[in-house]
């Protein structure tokens, strides 16, 4: 749509869903900006563009959203670009700033949030028998990815090696997984195949781990299907236990 503030239909989305505080905040920010800054500031793709300007990257700047998997998707795109020979290095960044009162209310209505507000050690305990939900969080993180050859050539301190990537979509429900866990099972198997690894080579799984009965049940089903009886002795947790859910 046009950028001008006198665009006749500028309130159409706002009027269609007045319960969404996001549109109200967007309008408030837009009113405070100079007219020429509105498009650049609110355009989704400008996030990657500004990072490219800041750090001088020359690869394709991509801004994406795959909800909770956005950071992992950014890493996968970087890995695949390096594999294709499009670049030696890739900057993959994940960021989230969606902790609002409305988000807290909606997740609370789903009984998805931990109520251990006064005892943080008991909050957000993925797969624990006494878990009661996750802690909503905000934050960002960045990884510099590069080919192993490039890293060794410059004497880099290598923190980890990405052996494989994989993903699948679950079209069953917005917040619930398919009952047979087939998309999650396929995703794990896709990663193993891409990495050229067997199930027996995996020693730890960092799961989605929302500390909710629905998530824990489906992740256990998918992992036990892929790894069999080994899942009983294999460490499984989630970084949500330390930094919350972004």
Model-derived features with residue positions:
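Acyl-CoA/ACP chain-elongation machinery
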Residues: 86-132, 165-179, 207-217, 233-246
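Condensing-enzyme catalytic core mediating Claisen C-C bond formation in acyl metabolism
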Residues: 118-197, 203-204
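Conserved active-site and cofactor/substrate-binding residues in soluble primary-metabolism enzymes
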Residues: 42-46, 69-73, 85, 102, ...
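Short beta-strand segments
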Residues: 1, 65, 90-96, 137, ...
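Conserved catalytic cysteine-centered active-site region
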Residues: 3-77, 86, 109-135, 222-246
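Conserved active-site "lid/cap" helical segment
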Residues: 1-2, 6, 13-14, 187-199
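Conserved small-residue
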Residues: 51, 71, 78, 107, ...
């Amino acid at each position: 749509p046009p950028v001008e503030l006198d665009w006749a239909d500028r309130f159409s989305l706002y009027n269609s869903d007045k319960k969404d505080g996001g549109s109200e905040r967007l309008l408030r920010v837009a009113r405070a900006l100079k007219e020429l800054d509105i498009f650049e500031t609110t355009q989704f793709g400008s996030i990657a563009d500004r990072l490219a300007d800041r750090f001088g990257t020359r690869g394709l700047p991509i801004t994406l959203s795959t909800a909770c998997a956005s950071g992992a998707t950014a890493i996968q795109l970087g890995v695949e670009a390096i594999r294709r020979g499009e670049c030696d290095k890739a900057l993959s960044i994940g960021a989230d700033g969606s902790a609002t009162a409305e988000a807290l209310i909606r997740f609370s209505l789903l009984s998805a949030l931990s109520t251990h507000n006064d005892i943080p050690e008991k909050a957000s305990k993925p797969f624990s028998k006494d878990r009661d939900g996750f802690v909503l969080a905000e934050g960002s993180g960045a990884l510099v990815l590069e080919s192993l050859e490039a890293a060794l050539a410059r004497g880099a301190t290598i923190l980890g090696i990405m052996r494989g990537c994989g993903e699948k979509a679950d079209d069953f429900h917005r917040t619930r997984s398919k009952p047979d866990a087939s998309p999650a099972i396929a995703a794990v198997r896709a990663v193993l195949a891409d990495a050229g690894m067997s199930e027996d080579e995996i020693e730890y799984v960092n799961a989605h781990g929302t500390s909710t009965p629905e998530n824990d049940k489906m992740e256990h089903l998918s992992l036990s299907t892929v790894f069999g009886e080994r899942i009983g002795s294999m460490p499984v947790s989630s970084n949500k236990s330390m930094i919350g859910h972004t």
